[in-house]
Amino acid sequence: MKQIKLLLLLASASVTGALAQSNGLTDMSQSRFAKMANTGIGAVHWTDGFWGDRFQVFSRTSLQSMWNTWNAPEISHGFRNFEIAAGVCKGEHWGPPFHDGDMYKWMEGVASVYAVNKDLELDKLMDNFITCVVKAQRADGYIHTPVVIEELNKGIDSHALEDQHKQTVIGTKVGDEDEKGAFANRLNFETYNLGHLMMAGIVHRRATGKTTLFDAAVKATDFLCHFYETASAELARNAICPSHYMGVVEMYRATGNPRYLELSKNLIDIRGMVENGTDDNQDRIPFRDQYRAMGHAVRANYLYAGVADVYAETGEQQLMKNLTSIWNDIVTRKMYVTGACGALYDGTSPDGTCYEPDSIQKVHQSYGRPYQLPNSTAHNETCANIGNMLFNWRMLEVTGDAKYADLVETCLYNSVLSGISLDGKKYFYTNPLRISADLPYTLRWPKERTEYISCFCCPPNT
């Protein structure tokens, strides 16, 4: 009898542990080629000490402060854009096209905190936001407030269409920055936004048990599957800041839908297969030919993290060769002691050549040449440093090697923590190692932390 009770106890503990792992921010508990899996998002509580204090500041101050900013139309249209797209009020889209994704990141942060403290006010706040997101989403699953608002203002009620995927891609002038149609301009950041919607929907379901936002994420992922099955090679280049690589793989883990895993593999296959790719966007050459870190550091690190997710599910050794080589290039030649990366404000690709002027490519907020690591003019965007942490977190899970945990810790204590003030209300976009008042030129971003940054991607990421 005692043996039976012991076996039941062990079985119960095993099931409990598996459930906790499957409720993590990422769920690699069933990933065939991962050696580790993290705990559930509500399974660990900071009770005291340095990180206990940071958690309290973030949960009590930062989340509400960000919401107040996004809910103040005179400062930011972050939430107002969703209200307009949902038909709650009328108006024009205002602000950068990636604000949707930034709000989804904030939503993911709120859900993560709610998983720990079960604050009912946070639950109401999330429900309020989710209601607008669901109303703003098109019937085919597409959601991008600049496009949806434009459609509404032209008298097109895309919310009312019943049949999935019967809407056509509006944009036809690929690369025209004045074109606002769906996927017309790769700099509209649609896939970036959709990727963060996926992650927010997953984390919200794991934290609350509700499926409202998750259902919207499923519809968006299905739309993306259809898009990449039918889109031209040119349109398929839409992968600016590819958070959707991570998002699609996590959706596969959350649903078991094999279409999502196939999509994640396809995203890597088509990368670099079109003309006029850029080092800045890591698509001048196919990913499997890349062995050095290049270009825009946020885009790069998001890409590397997403590819690590794909490796965890497929075990493709070529991808691990690329990731290992790129990681070594970053850590030994292109990273600061703080874990910060992306040293250049603006520059030219190291792979360009003055002997072939047509091949010289501009880069921005990017990795530079080996050891090109200035102190006073370092860009080191907070999102790039967080991306470095996301990349190393996934490499830790798939390899079990502690060197990746060391890098996560280095970033967290230094180049990520520097992005937010002690009171949790002000933020840095850039994180130079030295700030000087005597520079003979003016840098683009302020030298002091501010409550609102026009590129508000870093605060919710932090």
Task: Please name every model-derived segment.
Residues 21-462:
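Glycan-recognition and catalytic cores of secretory/periplasmic carbohydrate-active enzymes
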Residues 1-23:
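Bacterial Sec-dependent N-terminal signal peptides
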